[in-house]
Amino acid sequence: MIEGLVTLQKVMLADGKEMTTQRAIELGWITPGSRQKPRGWGLERHEVVVGKNLFTDNGRQLLAFAFGERSPISNFTCRKFGLGTGTLPPKVTDVSLESPISFYLGGQTKPINTVDFSTPFVAKVEFTIAAAEANGFLITEMGLFSGNDTLIARRVHVGINKTSDFSPVLGWRIRF
């Protein structure tokens, strides 16, 4: 079974300075999903676990297409992320976020920063919510999307109380 784990990697303040993840929790900006860090995910000491995710049926199908190098490959690999305020538990049949938040120009997905493979059997997707994005929302759901906007994985969690004061950098690990 494919598993996923979302973590808060760091918090950047609006002035460009980095704040500790612990301080962001103390301010009520981030609510951790778990205080306990699972093993085998390649987590760094300062990372805060937001919670696990559910890999969708469409995500599993995209993985099969990518394995076979179906063209264009960008349609079948993780390229974007989305945010929302939905609270319904994820299901493998989900095809979208329950209640998406729009980014710039009304788009509901945004390009990820990077994907790295520094831990065996784990792909880590990193993405940033800019200081100017999703302000005034309690972000309770996230999704990873392919290049053609197919929902790969979805996570519903306690929340990120987003303001223009900070820009969270998140890591979403998928273990194979």
Model region roles, listed by residue range:
Residues 1-139, 147-176:
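Small cysteine-rich, disulfide-bonded extracellular modules of the LU/uPAR three-finger superfamily
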